[in-house]
């Protein structure tokens, strides 16, 4: 079995550079300092196939998934309900529509309540 962890974003809730306030203490000449908001891709592969689970759906998710060439997810784990961890959820629709298959979601009850209020359309059966 092989596990691969890909950091899709590691910036703060506003990303780096921040809109309106720039780079802070980060050196703008270093390309690694341009950071998207937090998301992590976990891939497990073995002789039976591959499983991909995304940790959090940052507002930068569309670009993150395109850059990582992700064409399917088996699941999404939400760590908590803050906007910088959840507001990319709509970008999952393209995967669901294309594959005509739901994506399993893992989250605690407070996060589930918040997401059902904000994004009810994501949790209905088409």
Regions found by a protein language model. Give the residues of each.
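Binuclear metal-dependent hydrolase catalytic cores
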Residues: 1-126
